[in-house]
């Protein structure tokens, strides 16, 4: 807060609802981009406190520059700061949000790589800026592609079994399922497809991960 990387926002629920409705009606980007409180005076903040408003703490995303992440699969990825909203870090009840708690935990645990689904890449600018705000070195980000069905849509229950327990109940061997899943979106090089757990562990590298979605082919699993 003292360094200006974060600020207290005293918006009421009603005011936030009105803001979202205004953005929708006027086809504006959705989110909180500073609102009333990012540049509010000390007097306005004191008045809000005196009136009994309880603030949240928001991260002040720089809206005048690009935010950059280095992704092990996609390389350098740039985001326009003016399209990233200011996320809540501490809620009005004093509890931290995921964005705040997870990044602090990653730092304290000495995390070197954040490996997660590509649907999280839109949150990466917030996380990178949070690391910068604390003066911490950001881990390497690895946004792996989703797994799709043979029809090209994201894998879901309508494609059939998606839980490991379902495959075990159907008689599939754990080693075969692990081998099959490992090769969706990752290539060990060459044309070898049948590998033991130890062989896959030895061959695995982030460089072998593919940026495009993999396809869940049930027929190939049966073959394995």
Language-model features, listed with the residues they occupy:
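Active-site cores that bind ATP or allylic diphosphates and position pyrophosphate for catalysis
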Residues: 2-143, 148-155, 163, 188
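Catalytic adenosine-cofactor/nucleotide-binding cores of aminoacyl-tRNA synthetases and other
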Residues: 122, 134-224
């Amino acid at each position: 807060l003292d360094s200006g990387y974060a600020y207290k926002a005293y918006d009421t629920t009603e005011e936030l609802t009105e803001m979202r409705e205004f953005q929708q009606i006027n086809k504006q980007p959705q989110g909180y981009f500073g609102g009333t409180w990012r540049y509010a005076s000390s007097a306005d903040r004191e008045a809000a406190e005196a009136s009994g408003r309880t603030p949240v703490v928001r991260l002040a995303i720089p809206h005048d520059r690009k935010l950059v992440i280095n992704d092990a699969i996609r390389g350098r990825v740039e985001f326009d700061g003016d399209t990233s909203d200011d996320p809540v870090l501490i809620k009005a009840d004093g509890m931290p949000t995921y964005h705040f708690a997870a990044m602090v935990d990653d730092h304290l645990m000495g995390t070197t790589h954040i490996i997660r689904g590509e649907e999280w890449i839109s949150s990466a600018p917030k996380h990178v800026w949070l690391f910068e705000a604390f003066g911490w070195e950001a881990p390497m980000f690895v946004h792996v592609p989703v797994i799709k069905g043979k029809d090209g849509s994201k894998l879901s229950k309508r494609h059939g079994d998606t839980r490991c327990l379902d495959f075990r109940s159907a008689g599939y061997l754990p080693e075969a399922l692990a081998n099959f899943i490992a090769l969706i979106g990752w290539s060990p090089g060459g044309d070898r497809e049948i590998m033991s757990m130890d062989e896959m562990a030895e061959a695995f590298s982030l460089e072998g991960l593919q940026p495009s979605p993999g396809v869940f082919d049930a027929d190939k699993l049966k073959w394995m």
